[in-house]
Amino acid sequence: MNKLINDYLTKMGAMYTFELDSEFNETVKTRGMENFVYNSFSEGQKYRIDISILFAWRDLVRLISGSRVNVLVLDEVMDGSSDTDGIDALVEILDHIDDSIYVISHSEKIEAMEFDRTIDVQMNGKFSEIKISV
């Protein structure tokens, strides 16, 4: 698990490593090998750790179960406190996944990103309007 997490952290440009022990206590080490706790990091750094853990769990479940789920739904992962570099790194990871990916977002910054198709849902009074762009 730790190897998977750190592989994703590397892809996200993190300059630190993350480890979980058998009781799921975390240790975060910088290049100088100083130990830190998760809450001592910036929101952007925590975002990278969170995304790395998410993808590591996904990979681990695939390895253990032997089944291949081909849908990935990410709800508001680009709406939080990540910086532009963190979001760019996430998009790069998503570009290498062959599954159907659904990114749900309320952020306007996602509109500038290139996706194969977008479904825009807007409230119009008491009803929702749906626009599909290809």
Where in this protein do the model-derived segments appear?
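Terminal ABC-like ATPase head and other globular end-domains that cap long coiled-coil arms
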Residues: 1-134
